[in-house]
Amino acid sequence: MRHRHGYRKLGRTSTHRAALLKNLTIAIIKAGKIETTLPKAKELRGYVERLITRARKGDFNAHRAVFASLQDKEATNKLVTEIAPKFADRNGGYTRIIKTRIRRGDAAEMAFIEFVA
């Protein structure tokens, strides 16, 4: 039974999963839109939205908290100074997932994940 199981394991160890989500987050911040598998996109959505909510405050502590999660100065600065202010009047729902195709090699469902505004 999977009662009250709060996240997808994505077939990885906990540290590998954390690194994967961090790298996908940096990629979406830098590019604005990425294509990945549907389960990864669904798991990434919550991770990114929590970071944006934290970055919306825009103060020094928010900047530090975002950097602690990402460990990437360029992505942190872009998130806090460019992306988060766009969502100042929006309470959640900062990203959208669009199903795109079935990947030919392994029949995995693929999806785009992008920022809404």
From Swiss-Prot:
One of its GO terms (molecular function) is structural constituent of ribosome. Coiled coil: none annotated. It comes from the Bacteria. The keyword Ribonucleoprotein applies. Pfam families: Ribosomal_L17. Belongs to the bacterial ribosomal protein bL17 family. This is Large ribosomal subunit protein bL17. It comes from Campylobacter lari (strain RM2100 / D67 / ATCC BAA-1060). The gene is rplQ.
